[in-house]
Amino acid sequence: MSKCLPNFLIVGAAKSGTSSLHNFLRKHYDVFMPNYNYNIKVKEPRFFVKNSIAGRVNNYVDNFEDYKKLFSKSCGKSAVGEASVFYLYFFKEAIRNIKKYLGNDIKIIILLRNPVERALSAYNHVSRTKSENLSFEEAISIEDNRFKNNKNITPMINYKNMGLYYKMVKAYIESFKDVKIILFEDFIYNTNKSVNDCFDFLKISNMKILKEEKVNVGGRKWSNNFYKTIYNEKKHYLTFLKKVLPLNIRTKLNEWFYNEFTLENKRMKKQTKEYLINFFKEDIKSLSSLINKDLNHWLK
């Protein structure tokens, strides 16, 4: 395979820290991953599951020539990769196409989050985009038929099914010789070690993760995209504010703006949590045995 194509993939799971890991890895001098910068508009190419997501997702690469162009500046880098979370859920199509286009020696990285927490996080994410108008309880009760009957709805509404990791992970382990599993909680609480373990896995030098860099775990959502844009683009007017306002005032202003125009994410009801723990119980046990990791804390 060409050195200007990926030799590793982050395949999921959705809402499990993949974007943060992507951002940490791509800062390494010997890593290339497509991003929104440098005229590359696709952060998640999703090329290997294009048939599964057609009509459901707007932003994806649908042909190999365009896929190759994403990595045209990667030549000379030791680690070339991309992160597309739907590769885990639609594993059958993904694995078939990964082998077809990238070969069998590709390295696979999988982040896994407590499926109960992941389900609610996905719900909050979809709600943010205004693609969800049901309550969490309503959505998970009709999930299967909803996805089957609506060919335009995002795969992200598979709040429960996307957390049934066992068969997905098993398929990747059986299909590729180099598969690295990272638990979301390990990534959150020991980010530096988790990222450097990935560097070791990719056979490149370690790098210290700056303390101010944090994994984005969410928590609040913007009440309006206009306010989100203003907040995210604050660097453009921060220079002016530094000239007219002292630091303590700027800090309070920043906190006020964030708290005023964001909303708390939905929280899970006790009975809903109990239902989901029971739903995932057997799959978690099977997964625990498969990856040889204690996952009992996911059942509490």
Predicted regions: what they are:
Residues K43, K170-E274, N292-K300:
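The conserved 3'-phosphoadenosine-5'-phosphosulfate
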Residues N63, Y67-L70, A94, Y165-V169, ...:
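Alpha-helical packing segments of well-folded alpha/beta enzyme cores
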Residues M1-Y87, Y101-I106, V116-I142, F147-N149:
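PAPS-dependent sulfotransferase catalytic core
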Residues N51-R56, S84-V85, T154-G163, L183-E185, ...:
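Active-site rim elements
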Residues V61-K73, E132-K211, Y227:
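PAPS-dependent sulfotransferase catalytic domain
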Residues R113-V116, I188-Y189:
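Canonical radical SAM enzyme core domain
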Residues S19-D30, A94-G103, A122-H125, Y166-N206, ...:
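PAPS/PAP-binding and catalytic site of the sulfotransferase fold
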Residues G81, K107-I109, K180-I182:
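Hydrophobic/aromatic beta-strand patches that form the interior of the parallel beta-sheet core
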